[in-house]
């Protein structure tokens, strides 16, 4: 089970949960300049406060992401890699998969079928508990 540490009120805003020193961000809408800054700020607070090592992005409900979303992901990568952590993606739609490939984000993160698979894999690689 996931330990819920923050739940945003709006149905369109992402859920943030923690397991094995990994922050799972489950998106419920597309990621663009309207929401990327808010997501970044919440993720940063949780990563710093919770001494979290990894971040998993669950894109199951995402069909579009602009450059703001790409920047938000790269920023979280830079934040966790400094402490030996990793980022991963799961639930990737064909549309988002194409964006992640074109942007080169797959060079810094792996893709998994489920959040469970992603959390287990990166926790083992980084020693998360």
Can you describe what each PLM-predicted range is?
Residues 33-109:
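Amphipathic alpha-helical interaction surfaces in cytosolic regulatory modules
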Residues 6-41, 59:
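STAS-typified acidic loop motif
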Residues 110-114:
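Short acidic-hydrophobic, aromatic-tinged amphipathic segments that line or gate anion-handling sites
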Residues 2-7, 128:
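Intrinsically disordered or compositionally simple regulatory linkers and C-terminal tails
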